[in-house]
Structure formats: structure tokens, C-alpha cells
Amino acid sequence: MTNKVSLDKSKIKFVLFEGVHQSALDTLHAAGYTNIDYYKKALDGDELKEAIKDVHFIGLRSRTHLTAEMIEAAPKLIAVGCFCIGTNQVDLNAAKARGIPVFNAPFSNTRSVAELVLGEILLLMRNVPQANAEVHRGVWNKSATGSHEVRGKKLGIIGYGHIGSQLSIIAESLGMDVYFYDIENKLPLGNAKQVRSLEELLSSCDVVSLHVPELPSTKNLMNVARIAQLKQGAILINAARGTVVDIDALAQALKDGKLQGAAIDVFPVEPASINEEFISPLREFDNVILTPHIGGSTAEAQENIGFEVAGKFVKYSDNGSTLSSVNFPEVSLPEHEGTKRLLHIHENRPGILNKLNQIFVEANLNIAAQYLQTDPKIGYVVVDVETNDASPLLTKLKEIDGTIRARVLY
């Protein structure tokens, strides 16, 4: 089915920051979107405002920050895509208040992060980071002391989501006994076992790997008290969010010999560029693997992320689908022949849907299909109407008190 969109695709403007993968450009081009500005780096301040002032879609990774002020500087903005898992670089509430859905890629780098963590487990269990550092310094310290196979060791996973469960599968294939803690009851994969308390997991596992989102409840999840609950000689890995581990508490535990080692890929404060020095008390420890937030930085993951997020842009632009948006009611309505599609985003208050439908009743028009979803703050309705001219309808929809945004899609 082919429909004439309300705005020619050549006039719909995209801007992509931070060198997102070519697959994103390919996906947009294949769908007919060619008006794309592309930046290999993050922008901020007035430079960012200038770059986004006339755009409809913004694509970014983790270093471009869309604050409420920046969102206001983009009056034509329709949607935002985070070409990564995290969305804390975007003011989600400010975007919602403007009727702007935000999309991300919660699945595409799952395998890459899980593989990095597994590799770190193998290296730390064999004391490879220390051995590597010593040999670089000319020290030939051939020893089996403290070096272990992973087979039969207990892996504790905190957060059994996409990455945590993927790690569970591949770790078990190497013979590890997998335990996990999650605030929700989850179906264990393979022979993994869910424990009922965080304390039980921390005190019993040889390796603990963190896979939780950045929330107020997870800030400094691994603090002095929790680190003290770890087994003597345990290994701690964080490839989740930088605020989850109290870095000073971890450094002290390493100084005290509490842990065999650690691997940290994310930090509370990270350099903005390669020209800025990375500062951390963890730099002094040979038994700590430090990586610059590269958990999802593989060619395969970045390619998949490009396809996934750009694909969500296309669906929202073409048919209004908001499936998997992180800040918006999820709506997807199949297309219907011989109709015009209108989108209406409004404050979630009583009577708005009734007023909306009354407009079609007064125009003596049949609604071929309608889909409404709400969250506590906003409602989003997609309407397919049997008419040849939707312009008068759009004018009336915009006049409804409580309307945030309304437009004719096609």
C-alpha cells in the first residue's frame, strides 16, 4: 500500500551525532529519507542548538545531552533516537511534555556486553591482568597461586534482563554455576537459580556481575556495606551504569585485599573526549581491568543498533508506531485503504477522546480504525478516517483543550 505523506520525505530532516553506524543511514535512505546531517562527534552548547534548530528527528549516542533547554531549541522535533541502551542523556519528561517519543536499542548490543564480561571473568580468575602488567615491567612471576578455572565456580548476576540472561547462558556453557537476583520474579534459563535476597548472592558467589539500569534505587548499589558482604577473594564486574558502584569503596576494598580483582567499564564521571584525562583511584591496581565504556562497542552491535533505532524512526514517521518507546504510550495501528491517518497527543485528562470523536461525528465521517494508549501524563491516539481531506479535521483537533501535538500523517 502506498500513501502520500503529509510532508514530503525530502523535507523531513534528520541529524545523527557521534558517528552512528552506516546501517542507520542505509535504513533511512532505503525508506526514502535523504535529508540527513551527519556528525562524527558529540556537540553541546550553542553548537548543538544550531545543529538541531530545524530538525524533525535527532539520533545520538551517550555523549550528546538533550536537556529540556535543548529540546526547546528544536521546535520542529518529532522524535529522538538513542543509538545505545541508556537514555539518561535525554530529558525524557521534557520530551514527553512536548509530545516527543524517545526510542533506544535495548537488545542490539546484548551479546557484545555479555561476551566482554565473560572474557573479563576468565582473565581475572587466572590473574592475567596482574601477570600482564608484571611482564610489561620485566617481572617473570610464573605462579599458579590464586589462579583458577571458571568451571564449577559460582557466578552471581544482579539484574536478569537481556544482558544478564545472555551472560547466564554462555557462562553456564563453560561450566559455571549461575545464580541471579532481580527485583522481579524471572524465568531462569538453563540451570540458573534465582536467589531471594541480594545478601545471599553477594555472600555466596565467586564472581558478581552487575546488569541493572540507572535508577535512584541503584545509585551506589555496591557501596561499602554491600562490598563488605562479598566473599573474601571475590571478583566484581560492572558493565551496567557508572553510578551503580561506589568507586572509592571499591578502591578501599582492593587495597584491603578483600577482592581478587574487578572489571569496570562504566564510571560515574567519564571523559568527554580522548583529549581529556581519565581520573580514577582504580588506575593504581594491576588486578583491575578498566575499559572506556566499550561494552557495546563492537562492529556487530553498532550495526544492529543502527538498524534497530533507524527502523523505529521510519515506523514512527511512516505510520505513527511508538512501539518500544521509553517515554511514550505504545501504539501501533495497521494501515487501512482509503483513509487519512491523524495523530493526536494530549494531556491525559477526562473528556478529550470524546471531544476528538465528536469532531468526526459533526463532519459525518466514519472512523475506520482508532487506537488509544495512555500513561499517567499523556494520551496518544491514532485515527484512520474515511475522508479525502483531513486538513479541516486537523485544525479542529489542534483546538481541543489539552492538545500537545496533532498532525496528519498521510
From Swiss-Prot:
InterPro entries: ACT-like_dom_sf, ACT_dom, AHAS_small-like_ACT, D-iso_2-hydroxyacid_DH_PdxB, D-isomer_2_OHA_DH_cat_dom, D-isomer_DH_CS, D-isomer_DH_CS1, D-isomer_DH_NAD-bd. In bacteria displays feedback inhibition by L-serine. The active site is at residues 241, 270, 293. NAD(+) binds at residues 162-163, 182, 239-241, 265, 293-296. One of its GO terms (molecular function) is NAD binding. GO terms for biological process: L-serine biosynthetic process. Residues 341-410 form the ACT domain. Keywords: Amino-acid biosynthesis, NAD, Oxidoreductase, Serine biosynthesis. Catalyzes the reversible oxidation of 3-phospho-D-glycerate to 3-phosphonooxypyruvate, the first step of the phosphorylated L-serine biosynthesis pathway. Also catalyzes the reversible oxidation of 2-hydroxyglutarate to 2-oxoglutarate. Belongs to the D-isomer specific 2-hydroxyacid dehydrogenase family. NCBIfam families: PRK11790.1. This is D-3-phosphoglycerate dehydrogenase. It comes from Haemophilus influenzae (strain ATCC 51907 / DSM 11121 / KW20 / Rd).
